[in-house]
Amino acid sequence: MKVTLIIPMYNESSIINEAIDTFYGYMKEHFGDWELIFVDDGSVDGCGKAVEAKSADDSRVRLISYTPNMGKGCAVRTGMLASTGDIVIFTDCDNAYGTDVIEKMVKQFEESDFDVILGSRNISADGYDGYTFIRKLASKTYLKVLSIAAGFKYSDSQCGFKGYRGEAARRIFRNCEVNRFAFDLEATMIAQRLGYKIGEIGVKVINHRESKVNVLRDTPKMLADVRRMKKNVKNKTLV
């Protein structure tokens, strides 16, 4: 079984060497058949050069780059469509959820009939360890509002750690269009419409960076995006 790990990145020169060492070392140690895809979403700080150097040493490490910056959704979609794995996972370049959860997710795929597995900070009691009370409350409230608006039963639509069976990944993301942060919701809506079985796995945030989401500023726009996406996905001809 081949495992693909996708790392979207944008201007990550300060952490890219550590990210390469961490993810490469983990994949090499834990899986026999694997690929590691870094997708450079129009970075201007040269972070892709380190990936190019590693790829020259080991072709299982791949760099996909493009300009201009299009957003995380575009980066994840690009990686998914280029993947060749039987299981395809994406996670954040800063290794926010640690590496142990990667093998945990692969094992859950092996032991279940899920086609899609969503990481969730709301399953484990320690999922929000290290968050301030205000940030934890804001995050939980934001996610609850989005779930209600989207009509989801899933507890953490915006977690940056998700996995798919390869065939499902490539079919779902062929039908995705959203380039920025609402892409998670769109992908899950499409997965539901295609009839894929969706599960969740508990994750814990172990590396904290300041969130790019401002709850007060972004929630109204996100809700408008969700309403528009629900209509688009419902009426869309899927391929």
Task: Give residue spans per PLM region.
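Catalytic donor-sugar/metal-binding loop of nucleotide-sugar-dependent glycosyltransferases
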Residues: 153, 178-179, 188-206
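Short, well-formed alpha-helical segments that are part of the catalytic scaffolds
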Residues: 12-27
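Donor nucleotide-sugar binding loop of glycosyltransferases
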Residues: 12-15, 43, 72, 98
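Short aromatic/hydrophobic "clamp" motif used to bind/position activated sugar donors
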Residues: 88
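Conserved donor nucleotide-binding strand/loop of the catalytic core
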Residues: 34-37, 48-82
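Acceptor/aglycone-binding surface of glycosyltransferases and processive sugar-polymer synthases
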Residues: 66-82, 99-181, 208-224, 237
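Cell-envelope/extracellular polymer assembly enzymes that use nucleotide-activated donors
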Residues: 2-4, 35, 186
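A conserved acidic beta->alpha catalytic loop
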Residues: 40-49, 95
